[in-house]
Amino acid sequence: MSRKHSAPIRKVLADPVFNSVLVTKLINAIMLDGKKSLAQDILYSAFNLVKEKTQKDPMEVFQAAIDNVTPQLEVRTRRIGGTNYQVPTEVSARRKQTLALRWLVQYARLRNEKTMDVRLANEIIDASNKTGGAIKKREDTHKMAEANRAFAHFRW
């Protein structure tokens, strides 16, 4: 990996249906092998299922899910004096959003429902209700950070 230049941050266009950049980022997280239209179909279908099951606006449920899944702290490995320490650090705003979306999709894929749109809809609903795999991942991440609080002075 080259250390000279970091990749430029590209602007993401807002989703045409929900007019949200966050929805576009979720579509991009769902997308496999460049099949964006398939990812869009999955997400829109999942949002329709969310609307049917909760009788609420799917964007509100999705926003609540993202807010609940977003991590505040994480541990980063730092080598000091031949020993590796797990140092708790605050998560930057962009990484918070990225991790939340990644975890939602990751734990939706691990669910046992038949199709991805049902899995994603149920994971979004669970996350908005503070249950589910993505919430557990966030809690585990926070527990790790809390357990390694003694090494917080190694922050950089």
Curated annotation (Swiss-Prot):
Which Gene Ontology MF annotations are present? rRNA binding; structural constituent of ribosome; tRNA binding
Q: Which domain of life is it from?
A: Bacteria
Q: Which UniProt keywords apply?
A: Ribonucleoprotein, Ribosomal protein, RNA-binding, rRNA-binding, tRNA-binding
Q: Name one GO cellular component term.
A: small ribosomal subunit
**Assigned protein family:** Belongs to the universal ribosomal protein uS7 family.
Quaternary structure and interacting proteins, as annotated: Part of the 30S ribosomal subunit. Contacts proteins S9 and S11.
Q: What does this protein do?
A: One of the primary rRNA binding proteins, it binds directly to 16S rRNA where it nucleates assembly of the head domain of the 30S subunit. Is located at the subunit interface close to the decoding center, probably blocks exit of the E-site tRNA.
Q: Can you name this protein? A: Small ribosomal subunit protein uS7
The species is Mycoplasmopsis agalactiae (strain NCTC 10123 / CIP 59.7 / PG2)
Q: Which gene encodes it?
A: rpsG
